[in-house]
Every structure is written in C-alpha cells, then in structure tokens.
Amino acid sequence: MKHDRFFREHPVFTGEELGEYLASRGEMGARTQESLLAYHRRTGRVVQVRRGLYAVIPPGADAPTYPIDPFLIGAKLTPDAVLSHHTALEFHGRAHSVHTRITYSASRPPAALRFRSHAYQGARFPHALLRAGKAHACVVTAERAGMPLRV
C-alpha cells in the first residue's frame, strides 16, 4: 500500500499528523483523510484510541488483541504530554512494580481514558512551572519504536 511507510514510522499517530503527511504528498482533498481512516479502520489496519488518536495494527495481526504500546499512547494524548510519576519510572526500568495506569503531565489534560487494559490519567503541570515557562524542565526526550517521547 502506498501509505505503509507512514504507518511503519507512526505506530501511534494523531489525525493532525496524518493530515500533514497527506498534504506533503499532495493528497489533501476535502475528505481524503476521513475516507482513508475509515478504510483502514474497516480493514483492521488502524484502531481508534480516542477521537483524533489512532494506533496501527500490523498486517496479519488480530486488531482486538494486538498489544499497542501504552507509553506511545500516553505520549500522544496531548501535544505537550510528558510521561510522568510512576509511568516515568516504568519507562526507565526503575519501577518495582508494573501498573496498568499510565500517568502523563500536560498543560490541559483531557478527561481520563480507558483503552484496552490501561487507564490513562492526566495531571496538570505545576502552576509555578507554567508561569516560569519551565513546564518541560528536567524532561528528557527518549525514543521508542522510532518515535520521540518526553519523559
């Protein structure tokens, strides 16, 4: 398929990222993005995590049971999401236990989300850091599945 490269490079992606990709290829018609997503959702190649957030299912895998990396989902829930709290310890391999709750910090976290076996809970950046413009102080950017994540 002609969009396989995008799907390989973006195991979890937003509708905005797909729109930018389609525009860069000159394929941005009025309903191109919607019809492309609808087609791939029908065929089981893409699953919707929440409105505007999607995960790719490899060819031949069973869409309802294929494990999707929860860290990638947590890092894409908002444009400024940072994996935080116990989730950051898990990501770095320093946690003593594994949780099914993924915690991320953001300036305006959306409502809690449950997707498959994980619960995603947002926490607001501390107001003092936001006022000082240092919401991402001490945040490192790590790579996972070829995608940058803020932890």
Give the role of each language-model region.
Residues F91-V151:
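Phosphate-handling catalytic interfaces
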Residues T87-A88:
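Leucine-rich, amphipathic alpha-helical/linker segments
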Residues P11, A81, M147-V151:
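Residues that recognize and position ribonucleotide moieties
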Residues M1-D80, F115-H118:
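Short beta-edge/loop segments at beta->alpha junctions of small alpha/beta modules
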